Amino acid sequence: MKFDKIYTAKRIAEWLQAELIGDPNQEFKGMNEIHKVEAGDIMFVDVPKYFKKAFQSAATGIIVNEAVEPPSGKCVFVVSDPFRAYETLGARFYRFEALN
């Protein structure tokens, strides 16, 4: 899913009320799941055993629940509930309507 424009890591961290580890000026253009991420995308991972796979993915930003040092060129957003933060970010850009 692509954002309506490019946003900085600092701005996204503010929206998520996350601790940011990495470059606050890093730019993001969208979000997606681990198998579909591209450079400039954000994903989440909430199980530490998958952190390595997330860091090896094309994602530029990863929402996690532990403060870890990201590889060069990536940012980490630390929150208590990564899935909820990912949902919050998605809801900011994509309005979901219930089917009746």
Give the residues covered by each predicted segment.
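Terminal amphipathic alpha-helical/low-complexity segments used for targeting or macromolecular assembly
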Residues: 1-100
